[in-house]
């Protein structure tokens, strides 16, 4: 079920137009369940490829919440090996610019990989929410979990284009 990892040169080796340098931390997106729609699979791969231009990224499909926590580096035996962010309707909402700042701050201050997790149709258990470092929401509307994945991936890509001063975001 696991997807291959896509790599990019570290942001620390790149400079943006303001000559700022960025340190890179791996980003992992983990979701529950197989992708049923070919269009969703195609968009997932497209955005993983785009994100890989800026940072090492990995997309991983898992069977259930227990596998999700293990793949994200949050097992009882191993402890915490990543910063876990769950997509949840009760989470904090961000504008695209605020989300870019959130990612940039993590890149600058935290050496652990950043794992975004998307639950299944029933969301996350209280135990998973307690294990998370933060909860974020894609908005007040409810999205199908496969669609939420594509929206998250697009926003991660958009965040890196904002951080790098790329014109992708300027059309808003």
How would you label these PLM feature ranges?
Residues 126-172:
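Structured adenosyl-cofactor binding patch, chiefly the S-adenosyl-L-methionine
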Residues 35, 89-92, 120-123:
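Short glycine-rich anion-binding loops that position phosphate/pyrophosphate groups of nucleotides
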Residues 5-7, 12:
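Serine residues within intrinsically disordered or low-complexity segments
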Residues 20-47, 51:
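N-terminal beta1-alpha1 ligand-phosphate binding loop
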Residues 16-18:
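Intrinsic-disorder-associated, low-complexity terminal segments enriched in Asp/Asn/His/Tyr and depleted
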């Amino acid at each position: 079920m696991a997807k291959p990892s896509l790599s990019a040169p570290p942001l620390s080796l790149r400079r943006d137009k303001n000559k700022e340098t960025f340190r890179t931390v791996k980003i992992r997106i983990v979701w529950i369940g197989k992708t049923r729609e070919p269009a969703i699979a195609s968009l997932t791969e497209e955005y993983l490829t785009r994100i890989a231009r800026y940072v090492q990224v990995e997309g991983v499909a898992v069977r259930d919440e227990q596998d999700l926590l293990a793949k994200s580096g949050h097992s009882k035996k191993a402890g915490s090996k990543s910063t876990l962010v769950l997509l949840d309707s009760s989470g904090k909402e961000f504008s695209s610019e605020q989300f870019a700042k959130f990612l940039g701050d993590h890149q600058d201050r935290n050496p652990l990989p950043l794992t975004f997790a998307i639950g299944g149709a029933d969301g996350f258990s209280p135990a998973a929410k307690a294990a998370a470092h933060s909860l974020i929401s894609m908005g007040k509307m409810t999205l199908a979990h496969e669609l939420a994945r594509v929206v998250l991936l697009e926003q991660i890509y958009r965040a890196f284009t904002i951080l790098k001063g790329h014109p992708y975001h300027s059309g808003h």
